[in-house]
Amino acid sequence: MRMSVGSAVPLPLWGRTFLLLLSVAVTQSHWPSEPSEAVRDWENQLEASMHSALSDLHETVPTVVGIPDGTAVVGRSFRVTIPTDLIASNGEVIKVSAAGKEALPSWLHWDPQSHTLEGLPLDTDKGVHYISVSAARLGANGSHVPQTSSVFSIEVYPEDHSEPQSLRAASPDPGEVVSLVCAADEPVTVLTVILDADLTKMTPKQRIDLLRRMRGFSEVEPHNMKLVPVVNNRLFDMSAFMAGPGNAKKVVENGALLSWKLGCCLNQNSVPDIRGVEVPAREGAMSAQLGYPVVGWHIANKKPSLPKRIRRQIHATPTPVTAIGPPTTAIQEPPSRIVPTPTSPAIAPPTETMAPPVRDPVPGKPTVTIRTRGAIIQTPTLGPIQPTRVSEAGTTVPSQIRPTMTIPGYMEPSTVTTPPTTTTKKPRVSTPRPATPSTDSSTTTTRRPTKKPRTSRPVPRVTTKAPITRLETASPATRMRTTTSGVPHGGEPNQRPELKNHIDRVDAWVGTYFEVKIPSDTFYDNEDTTTDKLKLTLKLREQQLVGEKSWVQFNSNSQLMYGLPDSSHVGKHEYFMHATDKGGLSAVDAFEIHVHRRPQGDKAPARFKAKLTGDPAAVTNDIHKKIALVKKLAFAFGDRNCSTITLQNITRGSIVVEWTNNTLPLEPCPKEQITALSRRIAEDDGKPRGAFVNALEPDFQAMSITVTGSGSCRHLQFVPVAPPMRVPSEAPATEVPDRDPEKSSEDDVYLHTVIPAVVVAAILLIAGIIAMICYRKKRKGKLTLEDQATFIKKGVPIIFADELDDSKPPPSSSMPLILQEEKAPLPPPEYPNQSMPETTPLNQDTVGEYAPLRDEDPSAPPYQPPPPFTAPMEGKGSRPKNMTPYRSPPPYVPP
């Protein structure tokens, strides 16, 4: 009984142990091997349960890492492939946009088929752009549910950036030709095609497609091309040594420059075959393929843009840093010594090489010096320098102490060249004379004059002298420079620049714009190197700077001398070019500018004249406005070379500008070419065309244009259009060599306007005088209307003598009517004479009057008075007067 109970309740010791081991084994077989797996399994079960219960809730979007940041360069194509397999799976939509925005930047284009992001940035797109790439899945309600997202940045660098990202991002094929790489001081030969297009109006895809279509002509990959807009209407490069035309007759848009490299330091003889560009550009095949008119092309050598030296702070507080010296090797180890150093910086043993192994100077090869910004401290040496080992104090003295530093940062190489060992006299510099080209319009390539011989490229001096020992310590900085120099300049005094090649002489012509680029090998400075690193100043003989109103100007930034002389500047002028280095020392080169008379004189076949609004004094007294006017006139004709325009005169009458075109041949008369040029700028009635107005705006406003033939076309009038005049054949006039060409326009005005007007006025005046004399003579002897009216009103009838009847004379009113049968009246009674003396008879007068009647016979016939007008009248309107008074007879007394 006891045994059964005892064996049933308490288990033996080995039984409990066996059960414990069995339970542990079973538990381990079902438990995960790692705690993380259990956690993940639990999270997956929890996520599945939450998704089944809350299917409408958005899930948290995880961030996917895998798209690296990139960089782009202005004018270069950018292309990057998005690794969509890391973001999206089957059935998901990829959306690419600017971070925080709905669309991409204006210069980027996303291609969903190839999953590439490409574009071509302009100067306005510089900076950092953040791009967001997200994957979304179509939800049950039709909306896109974001799944994953990633953000990366693209930094756009300026145009002159040294290493374009497009070369790295494009990932060219293994068999593709690598882009040309020139030496640091070697110019790059670039071919540029000018297009009549506006890049700001293009989409990013159109810009990339333009580069791809150009690949058929250039045989260069798009990422090796450069596409930039035209700045300040500079379509053509004045330094080009080859050029050719396109099919575009005029420029409408702002313009675009598409260029690529041809080689390094090429010239006219070493340029590769460019017929694949020259012929299609001229014939229009390139324009048809690209979709934009081609204005022309040119080839020029471009200087590489070397990184500028960063100004350092001289009095910076030195901070002790650890300097790692280059490894040294020695066959026999000499005894160690200690060289005193300032502030005893801790110098670690050489564990990492940041400079080439130390070797003796090799003739003809430069040495490398690593410098940092900060204070420079010279390390004194004791006795001759010998290779040593590291001493117990931790100071290392190498065989030749080299400048070393351990500050990590950006290494920027720069090259310092040595002056040339030989000097060659440079020939005279002259601007291309505006010669008369041939009438053959098929010429497509324009070559510059023969290349001027220059001195050979500077060769580094051969030296075996060890470089100056220098130990540099600097405060913490983030940049350091690697300077390659043929001759060390540390510690040497500043030397004056040297004149290597003289400018000598510059030729210019009256009324023609000229410009001269000062060559880079004119001066040389040991510290600042070539001329373009020096400061140039143009002065007169008395150390006076050239004024703003001078006819010749100089741009010290671009080192370009330009001007526009007039007839008063004919002759020789002396100027001085001063080159100053950074230390203030200068060198001088004296040269002459020879101004010649107009190349065509009075033989130009046509004279163009435009009337502009404004004050002519503001143009004639400002050389910059005058040059701007010449450039605008050349631009209106489609000529980028301003020397094709010769300014003849600027007169009053608003602004009357007269010029000639040097591209026209003198003989025979180029009537078709002049007509084409005239129609380019003016209508048939003399009104300016819109292209001419736009070319002159906003500085000048055109009012009217006149194109008159001269020289071989002197009998033609082009604008306003007039029928040609027939001129009788006559012997050619003798040319006057000293005639002032500026007076020819005034002579033409007098000949065609003033003299005919004076002749017509004189003829009209003489005709008027003759008509007046004839009128006066015709009116002489006639009464006026007043006189005629007076005579008619106050006059009496006139009876002439031949109108009277002689048989019966009319009775006269002056005699009494006496009948024939009547007897004469009795005589008056006689009175005695004893009358008083003081008394007079009353009829004394009557008795006296009729006294003769008493003496006559009473039987005599009565008195017959003469007719009234027996004699001619003494005057008009006079009336006969009775001289004797008449009185009535006495009363009749019958017998």
Curated annotation (Swiss-Prot):
GO BP: axon guidance; morphogenesis of an epithelium; muscle attachment; nerve development
Chain residue ranges for the region called Disordered: 381-500, 724-747, 823-895
Any Pfam family: He_PIG
Transmembrane intervals: 750-775
Keyword ATP-binding part of the UniProt annotation: no
Binding partners and assembly: Monomer. Heterodimer of alpha- and beta-dystroglycan subunits which are the central components of the dystrophin-glycoprotein complex. This complex then can form a dystrophin-associated glycoprotein complex (DGC) which is composed of three subcomplexes: a cytoplasmic complex comprised of DMD (or UTRN), DTNA and a number of syntrophins, such as SNTB1, SNTB2, SNTG1 and SNTG2, the transmembrane dystroglycan complex, and the sarcoglycan-sarcospan complex. Interacts (via the N-terminal of alphaDAG1) with LARGE1; the interaction enhances laminin binding. Interacts with SGCD.
Record protein name field: Dystroglycan 1
PTM text: Autolytic cleavage produces the alpha and beta subunits. In cutaneous cells, as well as in certain pathological conditions, shedding of beta-dystroglycan can occur releasing a peptide of about 30 kDa.
Record bears the keyword Metal-binding: no
Biased composition (Polar residues): 393-403, 832-846
Glycosylation sites: N141, T317, T319, T379, N641, N649, N661
Database matches in SMART domains: CADG (SM00736)
Coiled-coil stretches: none
Record-listed Phosphotyrosine modification sites: Y892
The organism's taxonomic lineage, starting at the top: Eukaryota, Metazoa, Chordata, Craniata, Vertebrata
GO molecular function ontology, one term from the record: calcium ion binding
Region listing for Mucin-like domain, in residue ranges: 316-485
Naturally occurring in which organism (per UniProt): Bos taurus
PANTHER family in the record: DYSTROGLYCAN 1 (PTHR21559:SF22), DYSTROGLYCAN-RELATED (PTHR21559)
